[in-house]
Amino acid sequence: MPRTFVYKIGGSGTGLSQADQDNNIHCIYDELKGNYGWSDEAIAGACGCFHEESGFNPGIYETSHGGTLNNLPYFPGGMGLAQWTDYPAYSGSYPNPLPWAAMKDGYNWYDGRYQCFLMTKATDTTYTDMGIGQGARWGWQTSSRYPSTPFDTYIHNSSMSIRDAVTYWFYDFEWHYWEIPDWVDFEARVRWGQYAYDLFHGLSPDPPGPGPGPGPGPGPGPTPTVGKKLPLWMMLKRIPF
C-alpha cells in the first residue's frame, strides 16, 4: 500500500515522532524519485535541509513573526516542508508562495505531495513570479557569490556528495546569500541528509542529534556553525547580489 504523508497543522515547534519523520522522508523520496526522476543525492540534500526547516512536517508554519492562518494566502513567515516564505520576508505584504500556489491549483497548502510538486517548479516563472510581475519571489537562484549549480543539473546529479547536495539546496533554493548566520546549524543539515540517504537505501541509521529546527531526535546538541551573522536587513531580504 502506498505511503501517505503524516502532517500536524501547527505553529513553530509542532513536531512529528521519529517514525512519522521517517515515513515522510520515504514519501518525499517516492514523490521526487518515482514521479519526477530526481537523483537520490538531490533528494537527500533537500531532506537534510527539511529537517532543520520543518522537522519533515508539511503542516508546520512559522509563528515567530505573528502570522496566523486567517488570511491565506497572505502569511508572514515560513510554511511547509521547505518553509516557503513571503517576500519581502515576514512583511505579509504579498502572498506566501505555498498557500498561493496551492490555492491556485486546488490543493491544501499542508499536502506533502503537492509541496513536492511545487519544489519541481523552482525555475518555472508561472510559479516563482506568482503573477505579480516583479520577477522571481522564490525558487532556485544561482549566483557567482555562493555555491551554485543549474536546477536541472542538481536534480539529476547522482555523483555529488551529500554535503555538496545540501550545500546547493541551502544556497540556491533557500538562502540566496553567500554568508551563513550563526544560528544556522549547517552540519546538522549534512547529517540529516546522510540519514535520509541511508533510509532510501534500506539502512536503519540512528537519528542525528537535534538542530535548531522543530524536529525531535536523540543525540548530542548542535555542532558549531559556520559563517558570520548577517545584518538584520539582509536576514529579512535574503536575496542574491
Predicted regions and their residues:
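Enriched but not universal
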Residues: 1-5, 213-241
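Solvent-exposed, polar/charged alpha-helical surfaces in well-ordered, non-transmembrane soluble domains
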Residues: 26-30, 34, 44-47, 117, ...
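Generic alpha-helical structural context detector
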Residues: 47-51, 167, 171, 210-218
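Active-site or metal-binding loop neighborhoods of secreted/extracellular toxin and effector enzymes
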Residues: 150-208
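Membrane-interface starts of transmembrane alpha-helices
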Residues: 39-43
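Surface-exposed polar/charged interaction patches
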Residues: 35, 199-203, 239
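GSAT-biased (Gly/Ser/Ala/Thr-rich) low-complexity helical/flexible tracts used as stalks/linkers
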Residues: 2-12, 19-22, 197-217
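Peptidoglycan-targeting cell-wall enzymes and recognition modules
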Residues: 3-27, 31, 35, 51-161
